[in-house]
Curated annotation (Swiss-Prot):
A zinc finger (C4-type) spans 700-723. Detected in brain, thymus, lymph node, thyroid, spinal cord, trachea, heart, skeletal muscle, spleen, kidney, liver, placenta, lung and peripheral blood leukocytes. InterPro entries: Arf-Rho-GAP_ANK-PH_domain, ARFGAP/RecO, ArfGAP_dom, ArfGAP_dom_sf, PH-like_dom_sf, PH_domain, RA_dom, Rho_GTPase_activation_prot. The keyword rRNA processing does not apply. The lineage of its organism: Eukaryota, Metazoa, Chordata, Craniata, Vertebrata. One of its GO terms (molecular function) is GTPase activator activity. Residues 1116-1297 form the Rho-GAP domain. Phosphatidylinositol 3,4,5-trisphosphate-dependent GTPase-activating protein that modulates actin cytoskeleton remodeling by regulating ARF and RHO family members. Is activated by phosphatidylinositol 3,4,5-trisphosphate (PtdIns(3,4,5)P3) binding. Can be activated by phosphatidylinositol 3,4-bisphosphate (PtdIns(3,4,5)P2) binding, albeit with lower efficiency. This is Arf-GAP with Rho-GAP domain, ANK repeat and PH domain-containing protein 2. Residues 676-811 form the Arf-GAP domain. Residues 126-161, 1636-1675 are annotated as: Disordered.
């Protein structure tokens, strides 16, 4: 075939020839229609057009390289000579000489084409001319193309391939051996056009051997020979039969070269029916010794083995051999092999099962490149026998690439044939470029060349060649082995101090690599020979290896050793220069910079072919310099769970390489690329290609996916990877899944032939004979559907043919015994999978099983099928009697199978790990209500027996546990004797089968509906309910996900259930019964109460754990949350209730942000157990609770309003009529799921309530909609349409949800009660008396003032200044300061800071009585202004301060230490020193308080300090001067409040809203009625006792005082709401207030006036001692005591005044 015709092949035919026709559309879309168009295609271009699998790209590039190479050179042809056995054993055999050799090749249509190469060297001058002519075929001839003749070849539909009949059909009565040897020569195009030659086929007929089973066909190829006197092309075979085989017809030519030298040999060969040929020893003794070629190089056999292992599609030629003769290589007229194998190795080679077709015979890559459909039905044997290395292969070799072949290993000089030389060339050139080792790609390696003998003397033309005579015993001598050398050398380091370092250096003929020691497998550096410019001597026993990038300097101990190294390297360079070729350019699959553990800088990593190269940088890679190579054939890749998420490891037996990518995507790309390379390295396409010979095997038997590469070897179906995963779930007994590409050892010749004979089409005729069109499985079907389909198809036999259903078991067995002795395997398969017993009795005492019958009959395929189904047990199936069978099976259950069984656990459950370790496989039998387990299936005595009627609980574990043998599916059996039996099945189906059978035995009939549920737990419990709380009864319960099904005795209802996520209460308690403690579980759901307890502690623990888990939160879906009785998640109900109680009067409540840490803690608490978690005022902040509600609504799996309805909600806004729009909203809400509908109603009701109080909280419907629109719709941003929808829902809540009028009125009443405390009377009732000092703490400078719960520091400051009649000047700034710790620490309060909240926090101080407030001038105001002005310019405060921590966490020791501080962006950073780049600590200024000063007990080194307070830690800082202290304090103050440090200029001064801030006016707190004297007296005594305790311990009760202000205010409000109007409006003032109002600040302490007032008060109390007041009219004493603890401090006030304050 001409090269032009090959490259013009249509791309479709080309892709079909390599089994990649699925990419036809990709090529057409990219403009590639013929092979010629693909001349410039490369790997990256293939990726761009959409071919992603690396193996497919390699295959395409490989075949394109082979075809396109013929555009540059004309192919080299070969002469083939064979001998034929004549009827007359004494007849001479001879081979005539041929001036021209004819090569037979495949054309596009599958025909054979001949070409006439130039005349080659004459073999012998005087050879007899043969008068015999080629027997001509009757096929027509067309265009000089030769097609193989037709032959009836068994197709996939035929039941069996009979080797004997096949032999006859191919070659008539004689077995024919055809061997070919193709010798390649370079040919001139002009000579080729001028010469034509007749084709003569020389064959060799062998008579039948005695044992046919030990023989195989070896159809290797056709050899051509002829004379000049032929008739041109008339002798060509004609026609285009479809079969790949053709029957050779022609007369054999005898060559006297092979006439036996002794007449004694003839009879021997006649008896053995062998071709007579000289012995090997004779040939060796008489061979001429030719001249040794000057520059030839040998090829080692190890390389051939490596190529054979790596090749993805093997096409081997197997020579016909005789088992009675030693395995000698064929002797050809143009060459001879002198590398013989040992006799014993030859005898080991078995050719019993080899069945070769033309696909094995024509070994030319041209046959693959063109569209010849080569039927690859040859079966190869994977037994561990050595394959001969004299296999002959054909190749087209371009002239410029003749020498460009890579040799991986060096060997000693050897003899070889010319043909073996070309065999090595073929293997080198035909291998895909990506299959070469990357080392050879990057290195411009020294190539080992094999030259034909005709070219050893130079570049001779064809005429010169033809004039030379070639000896029939010409030998090829391989070149001497490459010099390799290794040893210890000193290498000069390239960087740093440039010191010599000892390295183990190796030179392997291709590159220099150096290691830390001789045991390491991975080098520290590689210097390829191609990168070396020269090697030169340097003084002191040193030599240099010079490359373009750098010069490597090595030093040795002796000069002789240095000279040896230099000599070896220079010789290698010289050899390279003589044979150098252009470097192969291959685009790497993946390259880039990665971090490699152990290296500081990033490493340039390259993945190409089956290796990963590590280089220092990209330039080194381009130059060929590298660090090391990681071969993929021994590697594995996995992700690494470290702090760096982008890490992965390549693991080899010798070392693990840990890489880190920059992004997660890059890491995944690398892992995927490496995994693909590993898979391609280990894959072998040979088995797949042979099995795909049957066209039906090219699509998955289950889902029709193309090119399936997995198979179930016992079911005889070829399946895809997705279906293979589901086949494994059936268990190895029902489906044995194996890979076509990687499980090579399992694929024997018989097994491959079995798959070819049956095929997916014929297999599906049985398995899917009743499959309907709508029940078919598709490629993209989900996993669950795929699993169900495969289970129904193979396990249940739902779709299989039922033609044999009428047969009984005995009849099926008889039919099976009759079928196995015939070649029809399909019949055997149908019988076996229809219920026949594979181990049934045959009636033959010797051949007692069907397998032995098949062996007796010599049916190897039947034997193979029965062998892989020896454990199969497919039940007899009848669709029509299915109901009857199931009914009978329910009444009498019998099961037997191997199960994993663990020893029974007594008194308590063993650990899971221990149970799994003690698990052993047992033969289990369930029969007659007893479960017995045996040591094995042959044992007669059981190891144990379980009475199923005694079972009280059966637990099923849906998760699979893993043993060394694989996953197992566990179920547990509990007995009243506190024994637990654990069993494990290999599949989930087997687990369900056993548990259903066991449950039917111990669950009574009235509760059998429980067994219909998909339960995880089923059994018997004792219960009590509201119908009978006096005694315990027995009931049957089953757990199904989150539902508890139960059937209770004494109830007419057959069954009921509890929704466990709706439980209002789930608690466990202990009671005593009959002297024993009993654990009882209480379940309350919507008014139904159920008490349960178990028979034993073990089974109760199982039930309690399962119920508690099912009742908890399971996922982020709304329906998976713990629900209230109204189907509203408990977390939503709790947040709504808390905000309603404490937040209706809070301004902008839903627009405030909470603390992220507190929010996450609350969410986690609710998720853990929302039912038992309670929100508490004081402990949980309002802002955190509102944020939790918004976060929950935003994070659920689907939006509350559902994303599916989103367009409908938005489109409703187009309706202008309000009533119509409201109707649409109602319709949308009714279409929501039940939980969504109930939750939405609760949310909108709450928002409606909040907006009703918008005058107080400023949260109208629009503001609420702005907040909640993104939460309810779960959109990233806010749109006006979403806001309008939510606003509509809030405003029209009553109409949309059809709320009744009385419910609306009730809501208004509740709102009024909740918000009433915000009125003037309520607000004043919550005021407290506080002593505030002016400028200094002196008795005459104090003022007792009323502090309201909402008073800010600015109000307090202005009120004090007004009382004192102080008018600040223009430059003065007054502020309120907080002074604590005995006046050692003070800080200014921000003008917006709440005063009362700060005062209440004093309770946490060590000495709360020493704290007070003082109003004075802000002396550092000028400094603050100055700092503020400088700060606007972007300055950052920094400096060295001395710090001490309390308690010590960061700092070591208990002394002040120098640290470097930086104040920036609202944070204070602490560094170890000025040079540190990473901070040790970061302080958030917003969460801390900074005081001026340091406590003396800290022993500060200076008197200028600052103290920082957080919730749990204190930090003490010391400055070196007062100015530094002031600068730091002011800078921190400014940073804390973001420059908003005083009220804006020109703004009206803010004053208190009360009538008179000084004592007087309305009551400060509720006054006790005179009639309640007894209670008041008790309160006074209690307060005095508390005061005494305070004075003794100087500590207050932190827990009671730490309550929030709003909780106390709400209590005060509650008291006032129920107070009688008459009493509340009484204008009379308490005498104590009159006393206080008249008291001047200057009055001396201890004045008798106070005593008089106190006496008057006591008289009034005595006078009204009998009067009583309703409890709702008094303030709880607890509140008085708590507030009093804060107010009572060590201050000098009259005792009478203190008593009066206590009373208040």
């Amino acid at each position: 075939m001409s090269s032009v015709s090959e490259v013009n092949v249509d791309i479709k035919d080309f892709l079909m020839s390599i089994n990649l026709e699925q990419y036809l559309l990709h090529f057409h879309e990219s403009g590639f229609t013929t092979v010629k168009d693909c001349a410039a295609i490369n790997d990256s271009l293939l990726q761009k057009i959409g071919i992603s699998p690396t193996g497919h790209r390699r295959r395409i590039l490989k075949q394109l390289q082979i075809i396109l190479s013929k555009m540059q050179d004309i192919p080299i042809y070969a002469n083939v000579h064979k001998t034929k056995k004549n009827d007359d054993p004494s007849k001479d055999y001879h081979v005539p000489s041929s001036d021209q050799n004819i090569c037979i090749e495949l054309s596009n249509s599958g025909s054979v084409q001949t070409s006439s190469p130039p005349q080659l060297e004459t073999v012998r001058k005087n050879l007899e001319d043969s008068d015999a002519s080629v027997e001509r075929s009757q096929y027509p001839q067309s265009d000089d193309k030769l097609s193989p003749p037709k032959r009836d070849f068994p197709t996939a539909e035929e039941p069996h391939l009979n080797l004997g009949s096949l032999n006859d059909s191919l070659f008539g009565s004689d077995n024919i051996k055809i061997e070919s040897l193709i010798t390649k020569k370079t040919v001139d195009h002009t000579v080729e056009e001028q010469q034509t030659e007749k084709v003569k086929l020389i064959t060799e007929n062998l008579s039948k051997l005695p044992n046919a089973d030990s023989e195989c066909l070896s159809f290797v190829g056709c050899s051509t020979s002829g004379t000049n006197s032929g008739n041109g092309t008339n002798g060509l075979l004609e026609g285009s039969p479809p079969s790949p085989f053709f029957k050779f017809q022609g007369e054999m030519i005898v060559n006297d070269l092979y006439v036996p030298s002794s007449p004694i040999l003839a009879p021997v060969r006649s008896r053995s029916k062998l071709v007579s040929r000289p012995s090997r020893s004779f040939l060796l003794r008489h061979r001429p010794v030719p001249e040794i070629p000057g520059s030839t190089k040998g090829v080692s056999g190890s390389y051939f083995r490596e190529r054979r292992n790596v090749a993805t599609s093997t096409e081997k030629s197997v020579a016909w051999q005789n088992s009675n003769e030693e395995n000698s290589s064929s002797i050809f007229p143009y060459g001879e092999t002198f590398l013989f194998q040992r006799l014993e190795n030859s005898k080991k080679r078995s050719i019993k099962n080899e069945f070769l077709t033309q696909g094995e015979a024509l070994k030319g890559e041209a046959a693959t490149a063109t569209n010849s459909f080569i039927i690859k039905s040859s079966i190869y044997d994977n037994r561990k026998e050595k394959i001969s290395e004299d296999k002959v292969e054909d190749i087209w070799i371009p002239r410029e690439d003749k020498n460009n072949f890579l040799i991986d290993t060096a060997s000693e000089s050897e003899y070889s044939t010319v043909e073996e030389c070309f065999q090595s060339l073929r293997r080198k050139n035909s291998k895909a470029s990506k299959s070469r080792t990357q080392k050879a790609l990057i290195l411009d390696s020294v190539n080992r060349h094999s030259y034909p003998l005709s070219s050893t003397s130079g570049n001779a033309d064809s005429s010169a060649v033809s004039s030379q005579a070639i000896s029939p015993y010409a030998c090829f001598y391989g070149a001497s082995a490459k010099k390799v050398k290794s040893g210890w050398l000193d290498k000069l380091s390239p960087q740093g101090k440039r010191m010599f370092q000892k390295r183990w250096v190796k030179f392997d003929g291709l590159s220099i690599s150096y290691y830390n020691n001789e045991k390491e497998m991975y080098s520290k550096g590689i210097i390829p020979l191609s990168a070396i410019s020269t090697v030169r001597v340097q003084g002191d026993n040193k030599f240099e290896v010079v490359t373009t990038q750098r010069t490597f300097v090595f030093r040795v101990e002796k000069e002789e050793e240095r000279n040896d190294w230099i000599s070896i390297l220079l010789n290698a360079l010289k050899s390279q220069s003589l044979t150098s070729q252009s470097q192969a350019v291959v685009t790497p699959e993946k390259c880039g910079y990665l971090e490699l553990r152990g290296y500081k800088a990033k490493i340039f990593t390259v993945l190409s072919g089956n290796s990963v190269w590590l280089c220092k940088n990209e330039q080194d890679f381009k130059s060929g310099l590298g660090i090391t190579i990681i071969p993929m054939n021994v590697a594995n890749v996995k992700q690494v769970d470290r702090t760096v998420k982008q890490s992965f490891e390549i693991i080899t037996p010798y070392r693990s390489f840990s890489f880190t990518a920059e992004t997660e995507k890059e890491k995944q790309d690398w892992i995927e690329a490496v995994q693909q390379s590993i898979a391609e390295t280990l894959s072998d396409y040979e088995v797949a290609e042979k099995i795909w010979f049957n066209e039906s095997n090219r699509s998955c038997a289950d889902c029709k996916a193309p090119d399936p590469d997995w198979a179930s070897i016992n079911l005889c179906v070829v399946i895809c990877k997705k279906c293979a995963g589901q086949h494994r779930s059936l268990g190895p007994k029902d489906s044995k899944v194996r890979s076509l590409k990687m499980d090579a050892s399992i694929w024997s010749n018989e097994l491959i032939e079995l798959f070819i004979v049956i095929g997916n089409k014929r297999a599906n005729d049985f398995w899917a004979g009743n499959l309907q069109k709508d029940e078919e499985l598709h490629m993209d079907s989900p996993v669950e559907k795929r699993k169900n389909f495969i289970t129904q198809k193979y396990k249940e036999g739902k779709f299989r043919k039922t033609l044999l259903a009428s047969l009984t078991k005995e009849e099926l067995n008889k039919a099976l015994c009759a079928a196995v002795v015939k070649p029809d395997v399909l019949e055997t398969m149908a019988l076996l999978f229809s219920g026949a017993d594979v181990m049934c009795a045959t009636g033959d005492p010797v051949h007692s099983t069907p397998y032995l019958l098949a062996k007796k009959a010599g049916q190897s395929l039947q034997m193979e099928f029965l062998y892989h189904n020896k454990f199969s047990d497919f039940p007899q199936h009848d669709i029509h009697s299915e109901g009857v069978l199931s009914q009978e099976s329910s009444q009498s259950t019998f099961l037997c199978d191997f199960l994993y069984q663990a020893p029974s656990a007594a008194s308590k459950l063993s650990s899971e790990k221990k149970l799994l370790e003690e698990t052993n496989k047992k033969w289990c039998v369930l029969e007659g209500g007893f479960l017995s387990y045996y040591e094995n299936d042959k044992s007669t005595t059981p190891n144990g027996t379980i009475n199923i009627n005694e079972v009280i609980c059966l637990a099923i574990h849906k998760e699979d546990f893993y043993l060394n043998t694989g996953p197992i599916f566990i179920f547990e059996i509990y007995l009243p004797s506190e024994r637990v039996f654990l069993f494990g099945a290999e599949t989930s189906q087997a687990q369900r089968k056993w548990t259903e059978a066991i449950a039917k035995h111990f669950v009574p009939l009235f509760a059998e509906n429980l067994t219909e549920a998909d339960y995880d737990l089923i059994g018997q419990l004792f219960y009590k309910d509201c119908h009978a709380l006096d005694q315990w009864r027995k009931g049957w319960f089953a757990m199904d996900k989150s539902s508890l099904h139960f059937c209770l005795q004494m109830q007419e209802v057959q069954g009921d259930r509890m929704h466990l996520r709706r439980l209002q209460e789930l608690t466990i308690s202990t009671m005593v019964q009959n002297g024993e403690k009993l654990d009882v579980l209480l379940l309350v759901e919507k008014g139904r109460t159920l008490y349960i307890h178990g028979h034993t502690k073990l089974d109760f623990t199982v039930w309690h754990t399962a119920i508690e888990k099912a009742a908890g939160t399971d996922g982020n879906a709304l329906q998976d949350q713990q629900l209230s009785k109204n189907d509203v998640p408990i977390i939503v109900n709790s947040c709504i209730a808390f905000v309603t109680q404490y937040g209706l009067g809070c301004k902008y409540i839903y627009q405030k942000n909470g603390d992220p840490l507190h929010i996450s803690e609350l969410l986690e608490s609710f998720k853990k157990d929302a039912r038992s978690f309670k929100l508490r005022a004081g402990k949980h902040q309002l802002e955190d609770v509102t944020a939790v509600l918004k976060s929950f609504l935003s994070d659920i799996d689907d939006a509350l309003l559902t994303k599916e309805l989103y367009p409908y909600w938005i489109s409703a806004l187009d309706t202008q009529d309000d009533k119509e729009r409201i109707k649409k909203y109602g319709a949308f809400i009714r279409s929501l799921p039940g939980v969504n509908r109930a939750t939405l109603a609760a949310i909108i009701e709450h928002l409606y309530r909040v907006q009703k109080c918008s005058e107080i909280n400023h949260m109208n419907a629009h503001n609420l909609a702005l907040v909640f629109s993104s939460c309810l719709f779960q959109t990233k941003g806010q749109t006006s349409e979403e806001v309008n929808v939510i606003e509509d829902l809030i405003n029209n809540y009553v109409e949309i949800f059809e709320v009744k009028e009385d419910q609306v009125k009730q809501m208004d009443i509740e709102n009024s009660f909740i918000t009433k405390w915000k009125d003037t009377q309520v607000s004043q009732a919550g005021d407290l008396l506080i002593e505030v000092y002016v400028e200094r703490k002196e008795p005459d400078c104090s003022i007792i003032i009323r502090i309201s719960p909402v008073m800010e520091a600015e109000e307090l400051t202005n009120d004090i200044l007004a009382i004192k009649n102080i008018i600040p000047t223009k430059g003065d700034i007054w502020a309120t300061f907080e002074v604590i710790e005995n006046e050692e620490l003070e800080r200014p309060l921000h003008y917006k800071e709440n005063v009362l909240e700060q005062v209440l926090r004093w309770s946490s101080l060590a000495e709360p009585g020493s704290a007070y407030l003082v109003v004075k001038r802000f002396l550092t105001a000028d400094t603050i202004k100055h700092c503020s002005d400088r700060s606007t310019l972007g300055s950052i405060k920094e400096g060295i301060l001395k710090i001490k921590e309390e308690p010590s966490k960061i700092l070591s020791g208990n002394k002040f230490q120098d640290r470097y501080f930086v104040l920036r962006d609202g944070f204070l950073f602490l560094y170890k020193d000025v040079k540190s780049s990473k901070h040790d600590k970061m302080f958030s200024l917003s969460s801390m308080k900074f005081y001026r000063g340091v406590k003396k007990k800290m022993k500060p080194p200076t008197s200028w300090g600052l103290t920082a307070y957080s919730e749990k830690h204190h930090w003490h800082l010391c400055c070196d001067s007062s100015r530094t202290q002031t600068e730091w304090m002011t800078s921190i103050f400014i940073a804390q409040h973001e420059y908003d440090i005083w009220p804006p200029a020109g703004k009206e001064r803010k004053r208190s809203i009360t009538k008179n801030p000084k004592i007087g006016g309305l009551p400060l707190i509720p006054i006790q009625h005179e009639g309640n004297a007894t209670l008041a007296r008790k309160n006074i005594e209690s307060a005095r006792a508390e005061l005494e305790r305070l004075r003794l311990s100087e500590k207050c009760d932190k827990e009671s005082v730490d309550s929030s202000l709003k909780e106390r205010a709400s209590m005060v409000a509650h008291c006032l709401e129920h107070k009688d109007d008459k009493l509340r409006n009484r204008p009379r003032k308490h005498r104590s207030f009159n006393c206080l109002e008249d008291t001047e600040p200057e009055a001396p302490l201890g004045q008798p006036k106070g005593h008089k007032g106190l006496k008057t008060l006591r008289k009034t109390e005595d006078r009204n001692s009998k009067a009583t007041l309703d409890s709702d009219h008094k303030l709880p004493s607890r509140v008085i005591e708590e507030l009093n603890v804060v107010l009572q401090r060590s201050r000098t006030l009259p005792k009478e005044l203190q008593d009066e304050q206590i009373l208040k």
